[in-house]
């Protein structure tokens, strides 16, 4: 959506190495530090250790729940309940305003702990509607969870796929557990691979950004890694993260105890280079813990070992608006702080076309408009204003509309396909312009034109309502 031709300045255009991605994918990935090589210098992430169980035993993994001295996937210092997790997210988001994404990556598999995982995601979506949600999984039960992931607003999913050969899979995995049955050997590999591919295809068909993680294991799966990249790219995955095997005896894994060699830097680089011919590569992965907090390569989890009382936490919406201004400033290199810059909201099913009725929108895409260009800042989720065909009048949903007004208090305009007369008037009373002239058109056409027309008519000191 953002292009150098959108505005004269062009300072916020995507880096050249994002050229393999569509504009929509590049915009969505830009603020996710694990999905964007440039984003990880500017935005922070948080992993929530709420998922202890696993349905797949990998020979390179040994889960630990009370470990503070190992830096690798599958370990955490503690386990959190969903209720504790959302308190911790609020605590961290207040302390680290660069936080853009919260993910569940273990210590086991999130989808093997489906009740805990979805309760956590639902609480975050309800209480912190602007945070990006992601999840990392082995993919075994992914096909069964796609619809629920979409419903709760997860739009980034990482799937660990180490091979597409069932015989090789039998060397990597000791067993899997599915529908009350335990499988091993080639049979387990066939089941796992089929379900992983099905899950990836279903996610990408729904517009979810899928990253593939693969552990490079010399002498086992290294020769077939380019085939993994090729097949998963064809299935719609957009980036491949090839990670070196960690196999040290002190970690207690099968490979570590059996002396399986780790790949050297040259082997890893050569494999990434071959795979990069068919699929963009992630090369900045730090193989984070299941409780990592902060920028990539900067784990601040030990600063947040004590949970505050929920009632002691400040209201979230003022923090949300402050964070939006900061994230816009980061993404535009300060241009969003100019007097003629502003934030706007778009009612859209996926962010690139204005295609939703105001009352039917369950999320708004927030864009920064400035001399730097049009930049996607975040998505904000909300209960729909209209709950049905006959429930779209203010007397029926005053509380819902008030909540939407509070959520959008820092924007100058709302773009949608249609909007009722009463909410139109109420938005105008709050200084928010309802815009329907761009219905069914790309945001990349409508928003820049609107900004160019309006920018000269605003006062020199443009107030940002709702921002403390």
Curated annotation (Swiss-Prot):
Q: Where does [4Fe-4S] cluster 1 bind?
A: 54, 58, 61
* Cofactor descriptive note: Binds 3 [4Fe-4S] clusters per monomer. One cluster is coordinated with 3 cysteines and an exchangeable S-adenosyl-L-methionine. The two others probably act as substrate.
InterPro entries assigned to the protein according to its UniProt record, in alphabetical order: Aldolase_TIM, Di-Nase_FeMo-co_biosynth, DiNase_FeMo-co_biosyn_sf, Elp3/MiaA/NifB-like_rSAM, MoaA_NifB_PqqE_Fe-S-bd_CS, Nase_CF_NifB, NifB_C, rSAM
Q: Where does [4Fe-4S] cluster 2 bind?
A: 285, 288
The enzyme's main class, written as a single word, is lyase
The protein's matches in SUPFAM superfamilies, at most eight in alphabetical order, are given as: Nitrogenase accessory factor-like, Radical SAM enzymes
One GO term (biological process): nitrogen fixation
Recorded GO molecular functions are: 4 iron, 4 sulfur cluster binding; lyase activity; metal ion binding
**Residues engaged in binding S-adenosyl-L-methionine:** 60, 108, 160, 212
- Necessary cofactors: [4Fe-4S] cluster
Q: Which segments constitute the Radical SAM core domain?
A: 40-289
Keywords on record: 4Fe-4S, Iron, Iron-sulfur, Lyase, Metal-binding, Nitrogen fixation, S-adenosyl-L-methionine
User: EC number(s) per UniProt?
Assistant: 4.-.-.-
Q: Does the keyword Nucleotide-binding apply?
A: no
Q: In which pathway does it act?
A: Cofactor biosynthesis; Fe-Mo cofactor biosynthesis
Describe its function: Involved in the biosynthesis of the iron-molybdenum cofactor (FeMo-co or M-cluster) found in the dinitrogenase enzyme of the nitrogenase complex in nitrogen-fixing microorganisms. NifB catalyzes the crucial step of radical SAM-dependent carbide insertion that occurs concomitant with the insertion of a 9th sulfur and the rearrangement/coupling of two [4Fe-4S] clusters into a [8Fe-9S-C] cluster, the precursor to the M-cluster.
Record-stated family: Belongs to the radical SAM superfamily. NifB family.
In Swiss-Prot or TrEMBL terms, this protein is called: FeMo cofactor biosynthesis protein NifB
